[in-house]
Amino acid sequence: MSLNIETTQGLERRVAITVPTEIVSKAVREEFKRAAKNVRVDGFRKGHVPAHIIEQRFGASIRQDVLNDLLPRHFFNAVIAEKINIAGRPTFAIETFEEGKDLVFTATFEVYPEVKLQGLENIKVEKPTVEITEADIDKMIDVLRKQQATWAESQDVVKADDRVTIDFVGSVDGEEFEGGKATDFVLFMGQGRMIPGFEEGIVGHKAGEQFDIDVTFPAEYHAENLKGKAAKFAITLKKIENMVLPELTDEFVAKFGPNTKSVADLRAEIRKNMERELKNALVSRVKQQVINGLIEQNPIDVPVSAVEEEINVLRNQAAQRFGGNAQQTAQLPRELFEAEATRRVQVGLLFSEVIKSNELKADEERAKAMIADIASAYEQPAEVVEYYSKNEELMNNIRNVVLEEQAVDAVLAKAQVTEKVSSFDEIMNPQA
């Protein structure tokens, strides 16, 4: 077998491969022998069909089977011998496949780029340091109390955290518009569900009042005919309800688990959960900065085939998340996922090189600690640890996560790292 490799464009390669006629002829003979033992033809016993009948009826399909075997086998033998790191599947083109002649074909495929890391010392990472305060815990308790809140009808004016029941009719230039009318609409004030100015126009009014609100639809509003338009809403305020928060008693805190018997227990449990969430958020924030720095310092081309595979993964994930079927998934435009898919392939290649160049292997003790941390969120942590330890697929997933963390640490060791004091809210609610 001889071959010739050429670069067509970017990461695309074309290999011309010649398979000697002796190998081809032998493969064809062996396939005919196998067929002769197994084919069934009316009028002949199995294994006794004449060769010319087999040739007439099955010759073309037998040769196609031989071709289907020879092409990938000799292609992969060639790329292994040449140590070519292929991406995706090759496309074959037959140049010669005739009796008594060499098999000549080409394979077009992509290769993964050669990655040589550089500029790690130029990567800048801001590492937040956060202390969870008693005030942070108080805020979390307030959230829990609001989740358990009841509502009491009020005759006072509307305040920012009330619940109101209203009728409204919206109009633009005196004409009502589709979707601008509702009856007995329940609105939780202060949540920003309505367009700017709507909630603010209700604050200060009393139940039973009728009044108008003048607002302007945002320029980016989803309805094309309303973008940037001035509108008037006629409001009938039917009912106002004040939020009534439950008292912080032992009875209240008992709702949050069998081991939570007092306010002190609840605060301790909240702190533990906040610490776990904070730790994960900090790891994620630092990792994203490392990823951004790696990509910025090491711009690389990625194989189209690898990106397409990742697009399919993202499509399927989107379908699972939103309940779509396979047909609907296939119709989702690739442009929705292309940027993220490209980034994922880049990150995978760069992290692989970090792991390779630093000769990293997953730290088993670190993996055990990660499982213990995951298990701590469950009521029976020992059972969770045992479940992980007996499931090799889950263990490998954990090892891969640990290996990525070790790769991040390896980059941080060379990067410019600065610490910044931050609050819990700044890390957990960066958009707030």
UniProtKB/Swiss-Prot annotation:
Its EC number is 5.2.1.8. Its main location: cytoplasm. It is found in: Cytoplasm. InterPro entries: PPIase_dom_sf (IPR046357), PPIase_FKBP_dom (IPR001179), Trig_fac (IPR005215), Trigger_fac_C (IPR008880), Trigger_fac_C_sf (IPR037041), Trigger_fac_ribosome-bd_bac (IPR008881), Trigger_fac_ribosome-bd_sf (IPR036611), Trigger_fact/SurA_dom_sf (IPR027304). It comes from the Bacteria. GO terms for biological process: 'de novo' cotranslational protein folding; cell division; chaperone-mediated protein folding; protein transport; protein unfolding. GO terms for cellular component: cytoplasm. It is an enzyme of class 5 (isomerase). Belongs to the FKBP-type PPIase family. Tig subfamily. This is Trigger factor. It comes from Haemophilus influenzae (strain ATCC 51907 / DSM 11121 / KW20 / Rd). The lineage of its organism: Bacteria, Pseudomonadati, Pseudomonadota, Gammaproteobacteria, Pasteurellales.
